[in-house]
């Protein structure tokens, strides 16, 4: 009986996963980062992180596919004498996909992002249905966040979530320190790549509900337009939010405008000028601070949450040679109220200034081989270029990242 059962199982697997339908991969990423306040090397902070990510893909008959990936990461902080080494396991993207002509079904742990990439962006557990038509593409999905790894989910909508988000994983209190806050979100999207032959359109309605016993819910109406011309790309987007908290409904706003100039060079290069805005609390409190579901870091040094902030940025991205590319950006940070953003460089004292300062950052990416990539980045944040806390220390950061891939 046991032999018969094993034989039937083998036949089922062979029929399900057709020949040459398997694929394995492995990625190892090693990061080293240091912060030097005011170029004082005696106050240098050093941080190391590595991530090992295996993946497996397979076809499920003629219409489906399976993707499984996981991650084991370690974090080390040599300056922390109490707990300088932590190993963290994680289930990353793991989903099944079935295609039935114009209808596509995706279920499991998947990546999702709103049209602007500022409200919800990352891994979520749930299902997504997509329909492709000649009039555009329609998607509808629902997801849950409470089983995600907290540090990857980056859900910090409330002050309690913000505080707990900075805690390290404690295996003696695993459930309270590992998992992300419990929230349910649902979204309906529409996009058309070329309306009238030249206009790209994306729009979505997204709602998130507190499933962890709290009472903070929010809804988002987002739209993004893209107009590609011969050597210029114009992007315009906006988000209208309703925040429900303690029985009160407050509107909030965000906007994103970008102008990208494609340079007439042999190797791809472009310059981008952009402005990103998120409302702060108005004086009469009729408008609230924009509150995204996930925290998408703004800047490479400040890594600010897009809430009550505006950013003006001028950046360059391009290939210097076939295996070598570079990025450089100048970003200026402005507060839109005096109470929402209370982090570096305004962590101490009362500040009446709105201008936080400027970040200058550059990165080199060297594709040494198809399976080895080296990233080197460095930059500074200069509070003296603003009036919020001009006497605060300059913060210098250096990042080194090496990625090894086996396909």
Regions found by a protein language model. Give the residues of each.
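Surface-exposed loop and membrane-interface regions of Gram-negative outer-membrane beta-barrel proteins
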Residues: 37-50, 58-105, 111-121, 244-250, ...
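Outer-membrane beta-barrel "beta-signal"
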Residues: 366, 393-407
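Transmembrane beta-strands of outer-membrane beta-barrel pores
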Residues: 30-36, 70-76, 102, 109-113, ...
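Residues that define the transmembrane beta-barrel architecture of outer-membrane proteins
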Residues: 42-52, 87-92, 120-125, 180-186, ...
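Repeated loop/turn-to-beta-strand initiation elements of outer-membrane beta-barrel proteins
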Residues: 62-68, 100-106, 135-140, 195-203, ...
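Outer-membrane beta-barrel translocator/channel fold
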Residues: 35-38, 139-212, 238-252, 275-291, ...
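Outer-membrane beta-barrel architecture
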Residues: 53-57, 95-97, 128-130, 185-191, ...
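Extracellular/periplasmic loop regions
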Residues: 237, 246-319, 323-349
């Amino acid at each position: 009986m046991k032999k018969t059962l094993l034989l039937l199982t083998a036949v089922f697997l062979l029929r399900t996963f057709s020949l040459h339908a398997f694929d394995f991969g492995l990625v190892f990423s090693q990061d080293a980062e240091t912060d030097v306040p005011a170029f004082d090397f005696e106050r240098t902070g050093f941080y190391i992180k590595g991530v090992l990510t295996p993946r497996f893909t397979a076809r499920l008959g003629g219409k489906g596919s399976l993707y499984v990936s996981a991650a084991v990461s370690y974090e080390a902080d040599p300056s922390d004498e109490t707990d300088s080494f932590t190993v963290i396991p994680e289930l990353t993207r793991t989903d099944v996909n079935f295609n039935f002509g114009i209808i596509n079904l995706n279920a499991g742990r998947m990546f999702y992002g709103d049209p602007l990439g500022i409200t919800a962006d990352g891994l979520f557990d749930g299902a997504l249905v997509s329909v492709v038509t000649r009039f555009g593409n329609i998607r509808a999905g629902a997801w849950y966040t409470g089983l995600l790894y907290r540090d990857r989910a980056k859900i910090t909508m409330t002050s309690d979530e913000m505080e707990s988000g900075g805690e390290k994983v404690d295996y003696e209190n695993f459930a309270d320190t590992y998992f992300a806050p419990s929230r349910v979100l649902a979204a309906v999207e529409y996009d058309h790549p070329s309306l009238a032959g030249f206009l790209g359109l994306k729009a979505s309605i997204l709602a998130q509900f507190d499933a962890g016993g709290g009472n903070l819910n929010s809804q988002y109406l987002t739209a993004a337009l893209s107009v590609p011309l011969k050597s210029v790309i114009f992007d315009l987007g906006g988000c209208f939010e309703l925040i429900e908290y303690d029985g009160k409904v407050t509107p909030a706003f965000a906007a994103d405008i970008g102008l990208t100039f494609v340079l007439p060079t042999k190797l791809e290069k472009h310059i981008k000028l952009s402005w990103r805005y998120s409302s702060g609390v108005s004086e009469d409190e009729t408008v609230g601070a924009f509150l995204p579901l996930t925290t998408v870091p703004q800047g490479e040094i400040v890594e600010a949450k897009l809430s009550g902030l505006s950013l003006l940025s001028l950046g360059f991205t391009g290939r210097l040679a076939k295996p070598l590319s570079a990025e450089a950006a100048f970003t200026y940070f402005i507060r839109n109220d005096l109470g929402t953003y209370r982090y570096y460089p305004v962590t101490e004292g009362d500040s009446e200034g709105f201008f936080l300062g400027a970040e200058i950052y550059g990165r080199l990416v060297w594709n040494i081989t198809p399976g080895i990539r080296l990233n080197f980045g460095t930059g500074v944040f200069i509070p003296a270029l603003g009036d919020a806390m001009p006497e605060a220390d300059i913060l210098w950061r250096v990042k080194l990242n090496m990625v090894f891939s086996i396909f």
